[in-house]
């Protein structure tokens, strides 16, 4: 076998198959800024205000998290959210039942409060237009 073919053959066997390379995890402050920029660029003003408030509250609440597993999970989910917003893949997207089943009661309560806030803003917006 020629040396170049030998190198090509060995290079493919050392890769991890068809799994995509994991995305690099952004540190908290650059991720926070990216999220706010994504909201400013891709969301309508009323949704942007609600989203910005939610992001600020969540990052404030997780400021003193010591558990690395919780921190990595938190940053990973927010980074995936940023990618969805930037790619306009979020419109009409439903919540994954598997993620919902893994949520704690407190997280489900937060989600319910967020849903109510969105619905109340929709009602207020409808009354103002009349």
Curated annotation (Swiss-Prot):
UniProt family annotation: Belongs to the complex I LYR family. SDHAF3 subfamily.
Endpoints of the signal sequence: none
Quaternary organization: Interacts with the iron-sulfur protein subunit within the SDH catalytic dimer.
Designated name of the protein: Succinate dehydrogenase assembly factor 3, mitochondrial
GO cellular component: mitochondrial intermembrane space; mitochondrial matrix
Keyword annotations from UniProtKB, A to Z: Chaperone, Gluconeogenesis, Mitochondrion, Transit peptide
Taxonomy of the source species: Eukaryota, Fungi, Dikarya, Ascomycota, Pezizomycotina
GO biological process terms held by the UniProt record: gluconeogenesis; mitochondrial respiratory chain complex II assembly; succinate metabolic process
Compartments (UniProt record): Mitochondrion matrix
A Pfam family hit: Complex1_LYR_2
Transit peptide: 1-8
Protein role: Plays an essential role in the assembly of succinate dehydrogenase (SDH), an enzyme complex (also referred to as respiratory complex II) that is a component of both the tricarboxylic acid (TCA) cycle and the mitochondrial electron transport chain, and which couples the oxidation of succinate to fumarate with the reduction of ubiquinone (coenzyme Q) to ubiquinol. Promotes maturation of the iron-sulfur protein subunit of the SDH catalytic dimer, protecting it from the deleterious effects of oxidants. May act together with SDHAF1.
Top-level taxon in the UniProt lineage: Eukaryota
InterPro entries: SDHAF3/Sdh7
């Amino acid at each position: 076998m020629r040396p170049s073919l030998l190198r090509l053959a060995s290079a493919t066997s050392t890769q991890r198959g068809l799994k995509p390379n994991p995305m690099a995890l952004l540190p908290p402050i650059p991720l926070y800024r990216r999220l706010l920029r994504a909201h400013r660029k891709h969301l309508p003003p009323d949704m942007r205000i609600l989203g910005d408030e939610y992001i600020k509250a969540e990052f404030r609440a997780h400021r003193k998290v010591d558990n690395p597993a919780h921190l990595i999970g938190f940053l990973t989910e927010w980074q995936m959210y940023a990618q969805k917003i930037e790619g306009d893949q979020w419109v009409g997207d439903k919540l994954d039942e598997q993620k919902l089943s893994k949520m704690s009661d407190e997280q489900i309560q937060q989600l319910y409060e967020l849903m109510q806030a969105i619905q109340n803003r929709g009602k207020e917006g409808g009354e103002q237009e009349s």
